[in-house]
């Protein structure tokens, strides 16, 4: 398990999305301060060198995979509260989805920003997940064995707990 700076600040032993009876509920954020929030998440699509070359040159039958995945990730971040039952609707002020192309993989990184009462980690994770799923959809005809892997939050800042970074 990866360690993170400030990890002890997060280990209160209580799950915020359960009430005293253990039932799921949406956290009431009415009294929380509105602050600038940022989260960065990443994930990896593992495939073959041939598929990475097709993606890099735009040679896939379905078209420009990276451009399509970027737009899909941005759209997904904006729809997170529709997909994750207990997430709040947030007014996102920025979403960036970027790709680092390796020899056998593509790393997907999403950065999400907002000025709101709750964090944007779920929006960043959703952006990465849907961008990765979109890439898979676009390459599955040439590599059905491609693997989506290692989706995680890398960094968050803002709110009562301040900054957290995965080490």
Curated annotation (Swiss-Prot):
GO terms for biological process: Mo-molybdopterin cofactor biosynthetic process. This is Cyclic pyranopterin monophosphate synthase 2. Homohexamer; trimer of dimers. The keyword Cell membrane does not apply. Keywords: Lyase, Molybdenum cofactor biosynthesis. Substrate binds at residues 86-88, 122-123. It is an enzyme of class 4 (lyase). Pathway: Cofactor biosynthesis; molybdopterin biosynthesis. It catalyses: (8S)-3',8-cyclo-7,8-dihydroguanosine 5'-triphosphate = cyclic pyranopterin phosphate + diphosphate. It comes from the Bacteria. Its EC number is 4.6.1.17. Residues 11-23 have a biased composition (Basic and acidic residues). GO terms for molecular function: cyclic pyranopterin monophosphate synthase activity. Catalyzes the conversion of (8S)-3',8-cyclo-7,8-dihydroguanosine 5'-triphosphate to cyclic pyranopterin monophosphate (cPMP). Belongs to the MoaC family. Residues 1-23 are annotated as: Disordered. It holds the Pfam family MoaC. The active site is at 137.
